[in-house]
Amino acid sequence: MKVFMGFDPGTKGFVSMIAEDGSFIKAEPIFRDIKVVDMIETANRLLAFVEGYEVRHVVIEDVHALYGSSAKGTFTFGYNSCVPEFFCAIAGLPYTKIP
């Protein structure tokens, strides 16, 4: 089945999938535990998420840290927001970042 994916890498982070006709297929958190990000486990979960589907294109929200956020919070947010882009690169999926 040909599908499209979308990533919202915000505070909680979610990934969703729709069919070519726009019908909803599924959605789930990007990270099992946002406070303890295990990149291997996250990559395996995302690979399982797309298994059996032909992903035509991925849209990733281009998010930015909030003004006045702590350095640690901004660094963590930036780290986590790169995960969807890295996943697409590793999985060979075409993607577009949108504001």
Question: What would you call each of these model-derived segments?
Answer:
Residues 1-99:
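Phosphate- and other anionic-substrate recognition elements at nucleic-acid/protein interfaces
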